[in-house]
């Protein structure tokens, strides 16, 4: 008898509550890569996502997020701040294929240049899951996702 075991590498992203192990890591990798492509091309990362998305609901979620977060187009270097603290914004988008749920977020962050400590100062969420049966349950799900993310 031969036994083969595969173990996940220890990462700061735990797949415990996600339906598919590795989902968060894959989404993170995809979104970082999109940010890098947008930066190299000098494009705004949110506009870049909208321009290359062929899904009407996804585009609408990103457009609603841009309005909600008062998104201002930006280019390659968007970090601001003098001294030890840099401030910036990040955007992320995901469509969960199995249930056709669309989520887009913007995070306002501060990064201490000396210590590397990151602090999320504000978080915006646009969410489209279709018909909502239990509004309180959906609100709890979204708020729980934000808490787990930050």
PLM features: residue spans?
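Cofactor-binding beta-sheet edge motifs in enzyme active sites
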Residues: 1-150
